[in-house]
Structure formats: structure tokens, C-alpha cells
A protein has these predicted regions:
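Rhodanese-like catalytic fold shared by cysteine-dependent sulfurtransferases
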Residues: 1-20, 27-60, 71-108
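Short, surface-exposed ligand- or partner-binding patches at beta-edge/loop junctions that are enriched
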Residues: 64
């Protein structure tokens, strides 16, 4: 099993299909701006078990961070832990998402 890095348009398509979005940034970053209905699991806490709790049906997940570095690390952790679902990595992160005009929400 491996993961696939995808662009913003492909990410938006997956989200429109109901794919679970996992944000691996820190809580402060998440509170400033995050994707609607995303689940926060910081990189230091990421595990197949935690993702399974958020996504019990093992459907597709889309992982993102700020710029695409932490999300790739998180995806590799899940691959190494034999996560059963399909794993996608938003290669431009939330910065690319915002730059492309896609919506975000804030908890601040």
C-alpha cells in the first residue's frame, strides 16, 4: 500500500465525493483556518488507530498540512502502519488550497 499526492482540483473532487479530510497541522494553525468538516490529528499524534476512529469504514482519506511536507510524513506513517483505506496527500497544502480560492473556516 502507498499513497498518492494530488493537486488542489483533484483534492476538491475527492472532498465533494465525501472523502474524509485529515489535517495534520497543530491546533493553533487549525483554529486559524481549516477545511470544512476536516478532522484534526496533529502529525505528532497521527496513527492508523486514530484515523480508523475518525473513519471507521476505512474509506478514502485526504491528508493535508500547511505546505505539503508534514502531510507526506503522515501519509508514510499510515502506510507503514498498514492503514487499510486509500490515502491521498494534498501536495500544495492549505496554502495552495487558499491561494486557489477554495473555502476555509475559522474557529477564532
Amino acid at each position: 500500500m502507498s499513497f498518492k499526492s494530488i493537486n488542489i482540483q483533484e483534492s476538491a473532487q475527492l472532498i465533494s465525493e465525501g472523502t474524509l479530510v485529515v489535517d495534520v497541522r497543530e491546533p493553533g494553525e487549525y483554529n486559524e483556518a481549516h477545511l470544512v468538516d476536516s478532522v484534526l490529528i496533529p502529525l505528532g499524534e497521527i496513527s492508523a488507530e486514530k484515523v480508523n476512529q475518525a473513519n471507521p469504514e476505512n474509506k478514502k482519506i485526504l491528508i493535508h498540512c500547511r505546505s505539503g511536507k508534514r502531510s507526506k510524513v503522515a501519509a508514510n506513517i499510515l502506510v507503514n502502519q498498514n492503514y487499510a483505506g486509500e490515502i491521498f496527500d494534498m501536495d500544495a497544502g492549505i496554502n495552495g488550497w487558499i491561494e486557489s480560492g477554495q473555502p476555509v473556516v475559522s474557529d477564532n
